[in-house]
Amino acid sequence: MAANKERTFIAIKPDGVQRGLMGDIIKRFEQKGFRLVAMKFQQASQDLLRQHYIDLKDRPFYPGLVEYMSSGPVLAMVWEGLNVVKTGRVMLGETNPADSKPGTIRGDFCIQVGRNIIHGSDSVESANKEIALWFKDEELVENKSCAYEWVYEN
């Protein structure tokens, strides 16, 4: 697995936190076989969020997005596993919940795009940038689960 092992940044947004969906979302990633490397429950500052969403700064919804994301606590996480960025995005569903299939996080728990409960990195490069923005190196925990060999072939 080492050749394709990667990490992704997943954040449960304020609406997901307020609706009590953190456990359900974490459970899905654990059941898939991904390993939690870091987790932080925090009130994100607008400065942090402006950096995080810098690629969207020219979009008309950008100010509202930053305001919404700073309106309550966020659960920021780093997950690791084989093709975790791509698979994580599939698990999340489409950005617009109306386009998300049942069985995806957004398909099961969301109605509107402006309250789509979760963020996931869209590429390995974005994941690396987002992880570095939200976490210090010493906050990333190396821990091989005893279930590792039951999830991955040699």
Curated annotation (Swiss-Prot):
Catalytic activity reported: a 2'-deoxyribonucleoside 5'-diphosphate + ATP = a 2'-deoxyribonucleoside 5'-triphosphate + ADP; a ribonucleoside 5'-diphosphate + ATP = a ribonucleoside 5'-triphosphate + ADP
Localization (cell): Cytoplasm
One of the record's GO molecular function terms: metal ion binding
Keyword Glycoprotein among UniProt keywords: no
One annotated Gene Ontology cellular component of this protein: cytoplasm
Gene Ontology BP terms: CTP biosynthetic process; GTP biosynthetic process; regulation of apoptotic process; UTP biosynthetic process
Binding site residues for ATP: 13, 61, 89, 95, 106, 116
Catalytic residues of the enzyme: 119 (pros-phosphohistidine intermediate)
Gene3D superfamilies given in the database record: Nucleoside diphosphate kinase-like domain
Main location: cytoplasm
Listed EC numbers: 2.7.4.6
The entry's keywords: ATP-binding, Cytoplasm, Kinase, Magnesium, Metal-binding, Nucleotide metabolism, Nucleotide-binding, Phosphoprotein, Transferase
Magnesium in keyword set: yes
Cofactor names: Mg(2+)
Role played: Major role in the synthesis of nucleoside triphosphates other than ATP. The ATP gamma phosphate is transferred to the NDP beta phosphate via a ping-pong mechanism, using a phosphorylated active-site intermediate.
PANTHER family: NUCLEOSIDE DIPHOSPHATE KINASE (PTHR11349)
Family per similarity comment: Belongs to the NDK family.
Descriptive protein name: Nucleoside diphosphate kinase A1
Species of the source: Xenopus laevis
